[in-house]
């Protein structure tokens, strides 16, 4: 019964709402099964299974795109994750140009609910699941993980790659590092973050903080899943101090949490440094440790 209650709460909340490491991000062009988790055309995910017999543990990947663009097909299916016996799920969600916050969070959570309900039929073991996101997708992956924690359905882990974590401090963090944001100020009315929220970040900084992972972590004092955080120390869009804030807030919420945090020297916002070499190796090791 407790499991049923937790599941009911989760469903209600959702409704209301890449040497060898290079292989990590090599695309696999076939074998993905498209699945609708809602009625909107953007509410779809795809599932790629490893060879062999399931059910398989799951890596759920959330694409970036400043909340206003992007598609799950932008994410290459990581072959060595499949080779490790882990299924790959890529999620689409509604975009801010047509659907403001919290539609994106609602969709990511609804996708997880769908996997929990229908995972067995898809060859998946949704009780063994890690969320991974890039950029805006990292914001959503971490947010979804926290929603799951809040209803007692914590994922096995989270991977956050160069994501914004607190809209209210993004400009200040860039200023601290002596940088000018390449896409303009987050506080501006036409920033991706302001357009997502439906109001300029500068006009309601407290609310902009409260809705994001850092603000939510302020209110959490319970066990959190392991997290891997990687961010370029030359990121021109999102200051690496956002990753540091995430690490510190995660630890404050759960002093016993397992946190694998590192900056990527010379790396900007995404690209090859996150697709090959050490970062790819680290992600695969994290997935293997938490899922298999």
Per-range role (PLM):
Residues 4, 9-292:
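Alpha/beta-hydrolase superfamily serine-hydrolase fold, recognizing
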């Amino acid at each position: 019964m407790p499991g049923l209650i937790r599941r009911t709460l989760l469903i209600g909340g959702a409704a209301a709402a890449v040497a060898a490491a290079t292989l990590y991000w090599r695309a696999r062009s076939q074998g993905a099964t498209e699945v609708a988790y809602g009625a909107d055309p953007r509410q779809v995910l795809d599932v790629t299974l490893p060879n062999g017999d399931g059910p398989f543990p799951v890596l759920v990947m959330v694409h970036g795109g400043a909340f206003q663009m992007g598609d799950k097909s932008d994410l290459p299916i990581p072959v060595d994750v499949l080779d490790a016996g882990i299924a790959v799920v890529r999620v689409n969600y509604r975009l801010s140009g047509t659907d403001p916050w919290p539609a994106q969070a609602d969709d990511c959570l609804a996708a997880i609910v769908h996997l929990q309900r229908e995972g067995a039929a898809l060859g998946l073991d949704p009780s063994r699941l890690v969320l991974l996101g890039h950029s805006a997708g990292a914001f959503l992956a971490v947010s979804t993980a926290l929603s799951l924690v809040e209803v007692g359905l914590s994922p096995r882990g989270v991977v956050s790659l160069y994501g914004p974590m607190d809209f209210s401090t993004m400009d200040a963090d860039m200023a601290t590092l002596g940088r000018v944001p390449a896409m303009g100020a987050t506080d501006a009315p036409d920033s991706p973050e302001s357009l997502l929220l439906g109001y300029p970040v500068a006009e309601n900084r407290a609310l902009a903080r409260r809705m994001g992972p850092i603000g939510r972590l302020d209110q959490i004092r319970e066990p959190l899943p392991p997290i891997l955080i990687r961010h370029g120390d030359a990121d021109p869009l999102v200051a690496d101090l956002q990753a540091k804030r995430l690490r510190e807030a995660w630890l404050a919420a759960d002093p016993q949490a397992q946190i694998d945090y590192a900056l990527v020297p010379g790396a900007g916002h995404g690209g090859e440094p996150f697709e090959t070499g050490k970062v790819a190796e680290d992600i695969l090791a994290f997935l293997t440790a938490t899922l298999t």
